[in-house]
Amino acid sequence: MASWRGVSRSLVLVVCAFLACPDHGYGRSRAHTASPSQGGSHLYVLLGLGNNSLGLSEFGSSIAQRGIPTTIRNYGEWPALAQEAIQQYQSGRLRSIMIVGHSLGGSAAVDMAAELGRAGIPVQLVVTLDPVGASQVPSNVRRSVNFLPRGGEDHFSVIAAHQRDMSNYVLGESRSRGPVR
């Protein structure tokens, strides 16, 4: 007969493996739309470890419902998303790229922007929410915003606390056609 200690330890390992796996379904976008319209904007939302970025998928879905094509994925998928964005931009189907990320997704957002910069592609907006580690925002990013937890917020509630701000930035930047600074 298995002891409760062994069962508990096994359960913890299963839960940890589930959360660490980027492809268990929660990171797949319900808001991912067909390819961006001719010369349009696209928002990439990068979730943190185990896709445990409460409210960020819903934020991405709400932006998609407002007509901005949105892709919601786990932070580990940023290299493939960068390649997709490069192809879309170079083909003329994408004019404006915006990236939002939380925790490890915030760090990945900066990495993705840097990869786009190496391809000579501007990024309209990068929003990070309590990113892990300090990253230098690359020069191809027109505007960057970093939200950190403050009075009463924690690593997860920072998303809910700044949803309106994020919406304003994303919706405002999707209409902007200004040069990259």
Indicate residue ranges for each PLM-predicted region:
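Bacterial N-terminal signal peptides that target proteins for export
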Residues: 1-11
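Gly/Ala-rich beta-loop-alpha elbow adjacent to hydrolase catalytic centers
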Residues: 101, 105, 109
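Active-site catalytic motif of lipid deacylating hydrolases and related acyltransferases
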Residues: 30-95, 155
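Bacterial N-terminal signal peptides
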Residues: 10-20
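Short glycine-enriched nucleophile-adjacent loop
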Residues: 109-117
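Lipolytic serine-hydrolase domain surface
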Residues: 43, 51, 56-57, 139-181
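Signal peptide processing junction and immediate N-terminal pro/mature segment
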Residues: 21-31
